[in-house]
Every structure is written in structure tokens, then in C-alpha cells.
Amino acid sequence: PVLLGISLLAFILGVLSPGGPAEFVLNQDGLYAPSEEQLEAMREELGLNKPLWLRYGLWLMGVLQGDLGSSYITGRDIAAEIAQRLPVTLELAVLALLMAGVGGIFFGSICAVYRGSFFDNFVKNLTNIMLSIPGFWLALILILIFSEQLRWLPTSGTGSLKYFLLPAFVLAFATMATVCRFMRGALLTEFGRQYFLVAKVRGINKFNLLTRYALPNAIIPVIALLGNYFASVLGGSVI
């Protein structure tokens, strides 16, 4: 029922969007407005004159059979379009996930171990700034510095790792701050639990206390957080 409701909502939003598919197909370059006769002919060709319930039913039956339809822009099968872009999306999402996860867990762990220190306070203030910076603004600044001024990284294209560094870092930037805070809080919670205090009394060194006792338990909710983040990146990200 939930998936059916989401599909119905997505279909209705597509229908209610301004312009409509017929006008979009006929006027992709935006240079002229098609006549009403042209629009009517295109609506007939695309099946847009059929009742809304019938159009939704035909679309849903096609989706259930693996037919996602054709793109209004390219005319190609949508499944083929997704298959063409999915590998690049996966590469970008995985790299952003690694940046956010490794950076957030590393700095969050240090902040928890040295709670109340200058480094802890500095990182907490830094994460406030990171969470308040818009992604598109950060992307523009990084492009100006690393692409326009230093000429180190490209601004577009795909291929080697250097093409993914800037967009992946921008996608991971705010999430890294969230993971850092989450990791710090989770570790501090584990530091106060009885099993950790008993292990500490037994004289186990700090590194083993962190890596063998606190970290395995504290990292579980962080992994769940990163899983949700990964799903959102795969669902579509705009910088």
C-alpha cells in the first residue's frame, strides 16, 4: 500500500507539473511556443488524452512488467538510461560515503577520547559551520580554488578518480559533520556503561578500550546513519 501510494503521488505530481510532456517535447530548446494543434497532436501521440485513471493503470502495469517507458528528452528506453548512468552514480555515492564515514568516525572518535580539550571544542564549532554551509556555495568555492585558480581538478566529466573528488567531497561535507557528532555522542555513551568501566578498572590500555570495547558498539548506529545517507545519494543528489 505504501509503495502504491508513493507511485500514485509521483504520477499525479508529474501530471500537475507546469507545461506538460507535450509542450516539453515540442519546445525543448525554449525558442518558440508550439501551436495548440501541435500540442493536441503530440498529446494524442503520447496518450495524454486518455483518462487519468487509465493512464496511471497502464503506467503501473508497465512498471510491474519491467517497462519504465521512454524518455521525453532522448526517446530512449528509461531502463537503458538508468543502466547507463547507474555505474557513475554508484562510484560517486561510494566515494562520498567513504569520505563521510572515514572522516566522521575518525574525528568523532578523537573528540570523544579527548572530550573537553581544545581539539574537541574546535571540531564541535567546525561541525556547526560545516552544517550551515550550502552545498552549492561550497561547490562554487571549491571550483574557483581547485579548478580555476590551481588547475588541479576538473569541473566536469567522468573517468579517473580526480573527476569525482570535488563532487564527492561536497556531497560528503555536511554528512561528515553529522557522522562526527553522532560518533562522538555514541562513544561517550559507551564510555559510561558498566562493561567499559569494568574493563578500564582491569587496566586495559586506552587503545584496546576504544577499539575492542567501545568502538564496535558505538559504530552500529553510525553504520545505520551512513546506510540512510547512501540511499539518499543513490536516489538523486543535486549540488
Model-assigned labels for residue ranges:
Residues 37, 51, 55-59, 63, ...:
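Generic alpha-helical secondary structure signal
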Residues 41-44, 58, 62, 80-84, ...:
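Short amphipathic alpha-helical coupling elements at transmembrane boundaries
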